[in-house]
Design a protein with these regions (language model features):
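Conserved phosphate-binding elements of NTP-dependent enzyme cores
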Residues: 1-941
């Protein structure tokens, strides 16, 4: 009986990792389990740092002795016992790949199957003339030549050298020794017993004359013999020159290999590597398979609206390059160009001469020496400087490769077709379209029986994997999408789809908020996908705040009651039905007892708008939209509808550039913005990490660390020892531990496994040396302070206003539970974003700021969302404007204004389908076909 209990459940006894308070918990196996609770309550600690970490540790124990030698250094989770634990796989929100060669297709392995499909049943076409490519046997070639016009005089040639540099004396000598008498050299027939001199730096073509013969039945054997000899001599290729009495001769190309006879081009046999952009066999030779190339961007080199003598040409004046600056002044003087003018005010001839040069010799002085140099033009000067200095990355832009048009492959690979489509077509179509294409067997009915047998298992694998992506709400993505541009939520759902495709059973999957970035419309799709994963005999533990996901769980574990030191307890575990009868925070929001409501603020009396015109990017075509200022505005819409394209890729960079450079014009790259005079800055608070090293933490990022170091340096003991504030920095020598260089951890390279961080055995993770730690404030060392939660530190430093005021802003955004010295790499995207928000709150406010946030509710419990809403509205109350990309209905329904994009993702999106107050968008949902409006209407009932 005891054995059955262990097999049916995962039993955790005495979990004390981080803030967990000796937790005992039984989790049913093979079920859909949701962990919920306030941010910082301990959900992720229990799911990832305890269950998953122990699963990984046990896996390592099963490895070789080489791997096991590190196990004593890899910390075991602080837990007494875990029974019934199965192999664990974590699917978190960390970006899938930073590799520019990774795409959605490569991550999911769909691209591998596409490569196989194209290699096995693809039809080759000539990339030049678009004619089908075919191959011929020797007998086919003989037959075709014998059927040429009767009595035609022909020369059968064996191509030896094709358009290559060299003198080729050895080749010519070899032909002589083999008995050849004549050859065509660069199109002219020569005798091989005569002296032939070829220039080794020029390209040459050499063709051996195998035979000269007349087409008739008597010469059939002679023709066959000559053809076989020519094919052997030139490795499967030959040329036939048909002589005509009163007209130029005609050339015909024949090949045993695949070739275009019209263009006289041969092609290699197709193999999967022919379609790999990571292999020389398939990669575009221009961009080496990246699809993009870096080149100088004129708009970054030159500001056309700034006077020439005030730094308009950044590449010359931006780096204080006096040599080029003096040459530039000499050029302007010689050509009569007034440097007080802007580039736009010069005539066309002057502009061209400035940019591209005009070959004139320029006299100028450099370091008191007269010099004379030709003016090459700004662009050539920039290239020269880049080659010399390699520091002009600020003036470079990544642009689509002109050779492969961004498709990464060689022209010969891109011209191959399957079912009438090229590889580029499959990579650029939305996944939804790709799924429907492969789901229709009539597209492949043209294949013969042998090809169908080959293609069938490949098509099955492609269809399954594409369906899983479509099923998790990613139908708007493309298989060619760069993995670096994928959000954390999208990345996680891609890996969920991949796991379903792997068919594993008996696995414990630990997921971190898979609903992030999903519109309410797609949430049920995701839940069904998770169910499919669970039904394969797996246990799912999902850390989640989404109402629908919680309501569809088999078992819910609520960690709380609050965050940080006030959390770490299991306040509820059981079914959803029992949860709704409970009276703690999560249950109160789920059963409607508590609601998230906006604070009461007076709306602005004056109404101003920011209008964006002529937006053309990705799926947005010629869009213009008005955004109200001094309000909380939500940009909504299904995934892939164009929200990020409009706000993050268009409004944000354009507005920042125009404001930062005080542009006279209000347009940039064709996009026009009206209403910028009502703003003085635009701030984007994203979810990127606040730092990439263990020495980055909330204290250093917000600036509170500087004040704390000053306070420690002011202590009597510190003054006696001559310690300055820098003594208490772990970024410089002096006070830090030199063994770990202030990291607190040491990285151990595992070679065949990911590197492992272990605590420094010298400072025990304190980051400082013993002498520094002897200095105390109110009995606490600098390491003790960094180990405090923000809430504890706020109480500790209550009498130090400069420190307390910065800590208060962190508490205001719901981050009282994080520690001051918490490693930046361990913070979630949502936490990093709120730390940035706290930093902004601590600055002096001008009341003319536009804040842009992308899904700030990421990782937030209902209680935390309520808290965040108050902060956002408080910034608006000060006269600022708040623009939020969001799917969370609790934020959307409490916004002042909504701009809804859609109606769907990808090509079916890119339009503003609804705008107005939440009530207006909800009331007009049937007319506008707004999915957001429909869900909003249910929420506002």
């Amino acid at each position: 009986m005891q054995h059955k209990t262990i097999m049916d459940k995962i039993i955790i006894q005495g979990a004390r990792e981080n803030n967990l308070k000796n937790i005992f918990l039984e989790i049913p196996k093979n079920q859909f389990v949701v962990f919920t609770g306030l941010s910082g309550s301990g959900k992720s600690t229990l799911a990832f740092d305890t269950l998953y970490a122990e699963g990984q540790r046990r896996y390592l124990e099963s490895l070789s002795s080489y791997a096991r030698q590190f196990l004593d250094k890899v910390g075991k989770p602080n837990v007494d016992k875990i029974e019934g634990l199965t192999p664990a796989i974590a699917i978190d929100q960390k970006t899938t790949s930073k590799n520019p060669r990774s795409t959605v297709g490569t991550i999911t392995e769909i691209y591998d199957y596409l490569r196989l499909l194209f290699a096995r049943v693809g039809e080759q076409f000539c990339p030049t003339c678009l004619e089908p490519i075919s191959s011929m046997s020797a007998s086919d070639i003989i037959s075709q030549i014998c059927h040429l016009e009767e009595n035609s005089k022909i020369i059968i040639l064996a191509p030896i050298i094709k358009d290559k540099k060299g003198s080729f004396n050895d080749k010519l000598e070899s032909l002589r020794l083999k008995g050849y008498v004549r050859a065509f050299v660069d199109g002219v027939m020569v005798r091989l017993d005569e002296e032939i001199h070829l220039h080794k730096t020029k390209k040459h073509t050499i063709e051996a004359v195998v035979d000269r013969v007349v087409i008739n039945s008597e010469n059939a054997y002679r023709i066959a013999s000559a053809v076989e000899k020519a094919l052997k001599e030139s490795y499967g290729e030959l040329e036939v020159e048909i002589l005509q009495d009163n007209a130029p001769s005609i050339r015909k190309h024949y090949s045993e290999h695949k070739a275009c006879f019209k263009c006289k081009m041969s092609f290699e046999e197709l193999e999967p590597l022919s379609f790999s952009f990571n292999s020389p066999k398939g990669a575009c030779e221009s961009c080496l398979g990246l699809g993009t190339k870096f080149s100088l961007d004129i708009s970054k080199i030159l500001d056309p609206n700034t006077p020439l003598n005030q730094g308009a040409i950044k590449v010359i004046f931006g780096y204080n390059r006096s040599y080029y600056a003096q040459m530039f002044e000499g050029f302007c003087a010689y050509n009569g160009i007034d440097t007080a003018l802007c580039f736009n005010e010069l005539n066309k001839e002057q502009q061209d001469a400035l940019l591209y040069g005009n070959g004139t010799e320029i006299s100028f002085h450099f370091k008191n020496s007269p010099l004379k140099r030709p003016w090459k033009g700004i662009i050539q000067i920039a290239y020269d400087m880049f080659k010399e200095q390699k520091d002009l990355s600020d003036y470079m832009s990544e642009k689509t490769c002109s050779s492969c048009k961004g498709h990464r492959l060689k022209a010969s690979s891109l011209s191959v077709q399957v079912a009438g489509l090229k590889m580029a077509d499959f990579l650029t179509k939305p996944i939804e379209e790709v799924y429907h294409f492969f789901n229709d067997p009539t597209h492949f009915s043209y294949l013969n029986e042998q090809e169908k047998k080959i293609a069938e298992p490949i098509l099955k694998e492609i269809l399954e994997r594409v369906f899983f992506l479509y099923d998790v709400g990613l139908g708007y993505l493309t298989l060619g999408r760069d993995a670096r541009t994928i959000s954390g939520g999208e990345s996680q759902r891609i890996r969920i789809a991949s796991q379903i495709g792997s068919g594993l059973t008996g696995v414990l999957y630990v997921l971190d908020e898979p609903s992030i970035g999903l519109h309410e419309k797609d949430t049920l799709k995701l839940i069904n996908t998770l169910r499919n994963l669970q039904k394969k005999g797996n246990t799912l533990i999902v850390v989640e705040h989404d109402k629908e996901t919680i309501k569809h769980a088999d078992f819910v574990v609520d960690i709380g009651p609050k965050a940080g030191r006030h959390g770490g307890e299991v306040v509820f575990s059981g079914s959803v039905k029992d949860l709704l009868q409970n009276n703690h925070s999560t249950a109160l929001y789920l059963n409607g007892t508590k609601k998230i409501e906006r604070p009461k603020f007076e709306p602005p009396k004056e109404k101003h708008f920011l209008e964006i015109k002529n937006v053309n990017i990705n799926n947005i075509k010629n869009l213009s939209v008005q955004i109200p200022l001094k309000q909380l505005v939500c940009i909504t819409g299904v995934s892939g509808s164009g929200k990020s394209s409009l706000i993050l890729q268009t409004l944000l960079p354009t507005a920042q550039t125009l404001l930062n450079h005080a542009k006279k014009t209000q347009s940039l790259n064709g996009v026009e913005i009206v209403g910028l005079e009502h703003l003085d800055k635009v701030i984007y608070l994203d979810q990127a990490p606040i730092g990439k090293t263990p020495r980055s933490n909330p204290a250093t990022y917000t600036g509170v660390m500087d004040e704390i170091r000053i306070l420690f340096a002011e202590q009597k003991e510190a003054k006696i020892l001559g310690y300055s504030a820098s003594r208490f920095s772990f970024n410089v020598k002096g006070g830090r531990c030199e063994k770990c260089q202030g990291d607190g951890d040491i990285k151990i390279e595992m070679h065949f496994l990911p590197d492992v961080l272990v605590q420094c055995d010298s400072c025990k993770g304190a980051k400082y040396n013993p002498q520094t730690l002897e200095i105390k404030v109110k009995g606490k060392s600098i390491a003790d302070v960094l180990n405090m939660s923000v809430e504890e530190a706020y109480e500790f430093f209550a009498k130090f206003p400069k420190i307390a005021v910065k800590l208060k802003t962190l508490i205001d955004v719901g981050l009282g539970y994080i520690t001051l010295g918490q490693n930046a790499t361990t913070l979630s995207g949502g936490e990093a974003q709120r730390i940035k928000l706290a930093k902004e709150l601590s600055k002096k406010d001008t009341g003319k700021t536009l804040y842009i946030l992308d899904e700030p509710t990421t990782g937030l419990h209902f209680e935390d969302v309520n808290h965040l809403l108050q902060v956002l509205h408080s910034l608006v109350a000060l006269g600022n404007s708040m623009l939020v990309i969001e799917h969370n209905l609790d934020i959307i329904k409490n916004a002042d204004y909504i701009i809804d994009m859609g109606p769907d993702g990808g090509d079916k999106g890119g339009k503003v389908i609804a705008s107005g107050t939440p009530l207006e968008v909800a009331q007009n949902c049937e007319k506008t076909q707004s999915y957001t409006g429909k869900f909003l209407a249910l929420e506002l009932e």
